[in-house]
């Protein structure tokens, strides 16, 4: 019966990812962004549950899943659009922007490591967690290169983004951060794509700065994590 569902075709993996994503997006908007209905989070949980309940192997899903994964990298390039729109702001405050993002990213990496050793995680788990500050498209190859588990890295990236999506804007308001540049950088640095989505709700400048942060954080993770990993692990 299951064989007739086309599980050996790319369409299967794509639909298993796309259907819950579309449904979750609808309800996420209807509930004004209730964090447990974040589309990425729901898609991940629904996909795992479906494969587990049906007994279909991950390899069958991966045929279509790899196609989605392929488009992650070119999709990341789209962050250059809002960056271009706010290029004058970038030119004017480039030192503060790059400095703030760099400090925030390094602190995030060190905090991840401290939490990991506090709970006595193994080196493979630590290696999987270190790249989570970047988007999935960047974090996965970095994780693979330092001996991490890509699936665990993907989970860490998504959970991190969901938390920032849910609480990021509230934290910004709690600390009374009124500068749109600072707000956008904070959300983009800590929550990557979903952080940018949260920044977009605050304003165009916040969205642009969040997009800039995502790009720069990715560059820092690619450059720094492979150097830090042999030292920390």
Curated annotation (Swiss-Prot):
The keyword Membrane applies. It comes from the Bacteria. One of its GO terms (biological process) is cytolysis. The chain crosses the membrane at residues 5-25, 33-53, 63-83, 97-117, 152-172, 212-232. GO terms for cellular component: plasma membrane. The keyword Cell membrane applies. It is found in: Cell membrane. Inhibits the expression or activity of extracellular murein hydrolases by interacting, possibly with LrgA, with the holin-like proteins CidA and/or CidB. The LrgAB and CidAB proteins may affect the proton motive force of the membrane. May be involved in programmed cell death (PCD), possibly triggering PCD in response to antibiotics and environmental stresses. Belongs to the CidB/LrgB family. LrgB subfamily. This is Antiholin-like protein LrgB. It comes from Staphylococcus epidermidis (strain ATCC 12228 / FDA PCI 1200).
């Amino acid at each position: 019966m299951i064989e007739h569902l086309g599980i050996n075709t790319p369409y299967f993996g794509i639909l298993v990812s796309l259907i819950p994503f579309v449904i979750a997006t609808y309800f996420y908007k209807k509930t004004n962004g209730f964090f447990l209905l974040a589309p990425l989070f729901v898609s991940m949980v629904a996909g795992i549950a479906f494969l587990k309940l049906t007994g279909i192997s991950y390899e069958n899903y991966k045929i279509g899943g790899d196609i989605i994964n392929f488009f992650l990298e070119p999709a990341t390039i789209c962050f250059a659009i809002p960056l271009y729109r706010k290029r004058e702001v970038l030119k004017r405050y480039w030192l503060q922007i790059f400095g703030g993002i760099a400090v925030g990213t390094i602190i995030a990496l060190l905090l991840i490591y401290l939490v990991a050793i506090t709970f006595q995680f193994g080196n493979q788990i630590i290696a999987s967690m270190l790249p989570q500050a970047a988007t999935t498209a960047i974090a996965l190859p970095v994780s693979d290169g330092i001996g991490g588990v890509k699936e665990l890295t993907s989970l860490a990236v998504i959970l991190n983004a969901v938390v920032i999506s849910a609480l990021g804007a509230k934290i910004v308001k709690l600390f009374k951060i009124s500068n749109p540049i600072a707000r956008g950088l904070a959300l983009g640095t800590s929550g990557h794509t979903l952080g940018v989505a949260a920044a977009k709700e605050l304003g165009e400048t916040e969205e642009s700065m969040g997009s800039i942060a995502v790009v720069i954080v990715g560059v820092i993770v690619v450059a720094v994590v492979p150097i830090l990993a042999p030292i920390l692990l």
